[in-house]
Amino acid sequence: MLREAGTPCVFWGDLFGTPETSDLPAVTELPLLMTMRRALAHGPQHDALDDPDVVGFAREGDEAHPGSGLAVVLSDRRAATKRLHVGARHAGEQWICVLGGHEPVTIGDDGNVELPVSDGGLSVYAPEAARPILDSAEQHLLRQR
């Protein structure tokens, strides 16, 4: 959904659930991730695939989309941190874990940051400055419920 390559396909059942045909609920975070794709997933991508159990990638953002940029860390086993390059343009910024569960982090002067992820978890980070965009997506989600 948030990577540079490809075009994501969102299925009706993922967005709204399919109670008539299965017990699969809607993916509640999907509207937020869709908003992040549109507003924040821009610019060069940097992959961190040096550990088979903890991977990540970051999008630097670009000048055409003020406040853009994001980072994603996934773990299939243990809690960990992943060092990612989000771009020197973000030096000194506070980034937040939009899915919750982790404290804000500060981007280093070189554009690098250590991002935590929980056991078997997914962490998605965005600039604190993007909070109005993210809050708007959350409000839309609450109205849909």
What residue spans do the PLM features occupy?
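Solvent-exposed beta-hairpin/edge-strand motifs
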Residues: 87-102
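Acidic carboxylate-rich catalytic motifs and surrounding loops in phosphoryl-/glycosyl-chemistry enzymes
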Residues: 11-18, 44-53
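Short, solvent-exposed loop/turn segments at secondary-structure junctions
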Residues: 15-18, 62, 76-79, 130-131
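C-terminal beta-strand-rich structural cap/linker in extracellular carbohydrate-active enzymes
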Residues: 106-145
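Polybasic, proline/glycine-rich intrinsically disordered low-complexity segments
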Residues: 26-51
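Aromatic/acidic polysaccharide-binding cleft in carbohydrate-active enzymes
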Residues: 1-35
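Short hydrophobic-aromatic micro-motifs
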Residues: 8-11, 69-74, 124
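Carbohydrate-binding surface patches
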Residues: 49-89
